[in-house]
Amino acid sequence: MTRSGSRGEELPVTLFRIDISGDVSEYSGDISNPTGIAFSPDGQMFVSSRLEGVVYRLNPFKEAVAFARNLGVATGIAFDPQGVMYVGDRTGTIFRINGIGEERTWTQIEPSVSAFHLAFGPDDSLYVSAPTVTSFDVIWRINRDGDTDIFFKGLGRPQGLAFDRDGNLYVAAALRGRRGIVRISADGSDAKLIAAGVNLVGLAFSAAGEMAVVSIDSVYSLPVQIKGTLLPE
């Protein structure tokens, strides 16, 4: 979990580890304004710094080593099923990063006032939330060629994303004026608020079927019995 702080703020610890029992431990303080976390298919941990425009790789000694640079306001990170990294610059660019950290612009979408959140769906498309100041924000869907379309429209400030094994998409967002976790059907035709909450920014599923929901200052565990997807198999 990241503790990003305000832009340029120096914090003694910016990454934390929460185990399955809910115990919190300090992990690393080497990265300023960390925002996105993703694990590669071989289990390596990568973290973006929105201050520096850099994605770092955490080595076994919990030291941060720069992996990719020149990524603008680097926020969300995701790996496709082939293990290729994608990084969202909230000013409007999605970068594709090769295995040695070289970046190239993959596609452009509208900028965000907060952060890009990225997740690959069961169709191998990249799904992106990019919150703005409207109440009709969209979830972008980007195919393997970098072509974009709107998967769903009508959310307020959508942020963290996660898929379940049935292809449903879960988003920390507001729907019809109510804030919480929204479930969007696999075909994008229907959306429903399944858990209410304010100031929610992210979510993830555990192997036990629990949903971890993150607010600006807390982490909650919901026993929803939903199996999620995390890494390519």
What are these regions (language model features)?
Residues M1-E233:
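Sequence-structural signature of mature extracellular/luminal beta-sheet repeat domains
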